[in-house]
């Protein structure tokens, strides 16, 4: 099962291309600590590898939209960050030349950090989330966060979003303070 999960994430592109061998701490975040950090959050991709007999695509799309809205709302509510609207939707790139172009485009729009990710449903009650924050200027990884959450209902997705939101904001501020 673990190999299949890694294969699905690799296939999704988040463990290949730009991210292999990247530095975990970027030299970006050049804005001073008293300025809001410009961040853009692209729509995450969703992969269901659970092989459940029931098609839950509509429910998963709805939960993913709510997850993304809440994540962006959390970034907006935190005055230490400035949310720059994402210009790619749906199917935001996560690897290769398309991602390099996306980073360039985000940088030109004023984004300093681009957050991308994927949610993968492994089984009836287990899902993985991989999130990567990339400095748009240096095109280096600021951080990666991989975690598993249990459940496939609104409450489980909300808990996962709250956890990720705190992690993203804390890690961005930590990387910024290490400048």
Q: What is each PLM-predicted segment?
A:
Residues 10-23, 27:
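Bacterial N-terminal signal peptides
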Residues 57-63, 117-124:
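Short, mixed-charge, low-aromatic patches
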Residues 76-116:
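Short, solvent-exposed, polar/charged sequence segments at loop or secondary-structure edges
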Residues 97, 128-129:
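Generic recognition of short, well-ordered alpha-helical segments
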Residues 1-6:
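N-terminal secretory signal peptides that target proteins for export/translocation
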Residues 50-56:
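Short acidic, glycine/proline-rich loop/turn micro-motifs
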Residues 30-39, 43, 48-49, 69, ...:
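C-terminal/domain-edge helix-coil "capping" segments
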Residues 57-89:
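N-terminal, post-signal-peptide region of Sec/Tat-exported proteins
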């Amino acid at each position: 099962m673990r190999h299949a999960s890694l294969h699905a994430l690799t296939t999704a592109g988040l463990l290949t291309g730009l991210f292999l061998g990247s530095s975990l701490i970027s030299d970006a975040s050049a804005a001073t600590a008293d300025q809001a950090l410009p961040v853009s959050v692209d729509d995450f991709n969703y992969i269901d590898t659970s092989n459940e007999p029931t098609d839950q695509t509509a429910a998963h799309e709805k939960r993913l939209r709510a997850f993304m809205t809440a994540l962006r709302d959390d970034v907006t509510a935190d005055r230490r960050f400035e949310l720059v609207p994402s210009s790619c939707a749906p199917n935001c790139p996560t690897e290769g030349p398309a991602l390099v172009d996306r980073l360039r485009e985000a940088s030109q729009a004023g984004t300093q950090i681009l957050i991308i990710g994927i949610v993968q449903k492994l089984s009836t009650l287990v899902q993985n989330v991989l999130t990567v924050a990339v400095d748009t200027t240096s095109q280096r990884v600021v951080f990666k966060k991989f975690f598993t959450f249990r459940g496939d209902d609104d409450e489980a997705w909300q808990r996962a979003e709250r956890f990720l939101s705190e992690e993203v904001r804390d890690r961005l501020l930590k990387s910024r303070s290490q400048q």
